[in-house]
C-alpha cells in the first residue's frame, strides 16, 4: 500500500509539473545554470561538475561522446548520483533523444527519492539535488506526459531499475541515516 501511495503522489506531482510548464514554442534544448554543477546555453554545455568520469566527455557536446558517457555510467550505476542522472537526462534532451532523457530523469528521480528517504542529508545537498531535478523535469515531463501509456511504462521501468540497482551510497556508514536499518528502510 505504501508503495502504491508513493507512486501515486510522485505521478501526480510529475503530471502537475508537466501541465504547468507546457510552452507554445517547442523546447529543443535545456538551458540552465546550477552553480557550480551545470551550465548549458543554446544546447551547448559550457561547464559541468557532476561526475569526474564523464564530465570531460559531456563537455565535448557531441552525441557520440554523450553515448560514451552513458556507457561508462551504465557499467557502474550503483554509486551514480541523482545529479549525474539529471545531467544525462538534460544532455539526452539536447541531442533530441527524448525517450532517453525521460529514462535518465526518472531513474534520477527514483534515486533521489531513495537518498532523501534513507539519508539524513544537509539542507544544501537536498536543495541542490532537488533544484537540479526540478529544472530538468520542467522540460522532460511535458514530453513524457504527451503519451500517458508510454509515460507510465517509463515510470514503471525506472522503478524496476531502481529496485534492481539500489543506490549503494545510502549504505555508506560515513553518511548519516534517518533509519537504524538502511536495508529495511529501502524495503518500505
Segment roles from a protein language model:
Residues 2-10:
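Sec-dependent signal peptide recognition
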Residues 16-18:
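C-terminal motif of bacterial Sec signal peptides marking the signal peptidase cleavage site
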Residues 22-79, 111, 115, 125-188:
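N-terminal alpha-helical interaction modules that lie
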Residues 61, 93-94:
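Hydrophobic/aromatic side-chain positions at a characteristic register within alpha-helices
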Amino acid at each position: 500500500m505504501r508503495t502504491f501511495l508513493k507512486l501515486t503522489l510522485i505521478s501526480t506531482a510529475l503530471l502537475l509539473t508537466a501541465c504547468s510548464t507546457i510552452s507554445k514554442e517547442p523546447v529543443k534544448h535545456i538551458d540552465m545554470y546550477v552553480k557550480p554543477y551545470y551550465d548549458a546555453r543554446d544546447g551547448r554545455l559550457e561547464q559541468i561538475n557532476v561526475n569526474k568520469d564523464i564530465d570531460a566527455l559531456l563537455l565535448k557536446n557531441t552525441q557520440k561522446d554523450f553515448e560514451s558517457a552513458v556507457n561508462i555510467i551504465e557499467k557502474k550505476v550503483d554509486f551514480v548520483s541523482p545529479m549525474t542522472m539529471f545531467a544525462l537526462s538534460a544532455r539526452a534532451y539536447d541531442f533530441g533523444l527524448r525517450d532517453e532523457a525521460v529514462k535518465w530523469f526518472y531513474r534520477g528521480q527514483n534515486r533521489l527519492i531513495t537518498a532523501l528517504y534513507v539519508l539524513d542529508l544537509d539542507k544544501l545537498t537536498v536543495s541542490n539535488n532537488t533544484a537540479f531535478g526540478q529544472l530538468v523535469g520542467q522540460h522532460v515531463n511535458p514530453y513524457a506526459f504527451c503519451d500517458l501509456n508510454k509515460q507510465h511504462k517509463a515510470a514503471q521501468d525506472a522503478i524496476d531499475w531502481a529496485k534492481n540497482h539500489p543506490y549503494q551510497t545510502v549504505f555508506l556508514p560515513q553518511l548519516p541515516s534517518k533509519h537504524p536499518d538502511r536495508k529495511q528502510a529501502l524495503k518500505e
